[in-house]
Amino acid sequence: MTRISRGYIARRRRRKTSLVVSSSGASLSKLITQQEIKALASSDRDRDRQKRDFRCLWITRINSVIREGWVSYSYSYSKFIHDLYKRQLLLNRKILAQIAIANKNFLYLISNQILKSEVNWKESAGVI
């Protein structure tokens, strides 16, 4: 019985997977396929991880600017966010981090207004 070549279909499929895994030094299609599966799993995992990492970075930036001491002695990120929600000032953390990096004075202005309105509210309610 004579040998029949399969044609270009398998070669085209292997070339396509080897282009996806471009850094592959292996010529074995099995290793290339395994690398492709691992790369796709890593990219899927790291898309979710990237969201967490950026949120953590934004929180760290906001907290460092708030704790510099201009605002209040015991003021922290958690109290700042709590006061923002109490005043219904819904600014997301990405925007607050950009404000903290680009224009610290504006963030101090926001936090001082929050603290002043809290003091005024306590005075009018007779708490102090």
From Swiss-Prot:
PANTHER family named in the record: 39S RIBOSOMAL PROTEIN L20
Pfam families: Ribosomal_L20
InterPro entries assigned: Ribosomal_bL20, RIBOSOMAL_L20_CS, Ribosomal_protein_bL20_C
Any GO BP annotation: translation
Family: Belongs to the bacterial ribosomal protein bL20 family.
Subcellular location: Plastid, Chloroplast
Cellular component aspect of the GO annotation: chloroplast; ribonucleoprotein complex; ribosome
The protein's name: Large ribosomal subunit protein bL20c
GO molecular function, one term: structural constituent of ribosome
PROSITE patterns: RIBOSOMAL_L20
Function: Binds directly to 23S ribosomal RNA and is necessary for the in vitro assembly process of the 50S ribosomal subunit. It is not involved in the protein synthesizing functions of that subunit.
Keyword terms of this UniProt record: Chloroplast, Plastid, Ribonucleoprotein, Ribosomal protein, RNA-binding, rRNA-binding
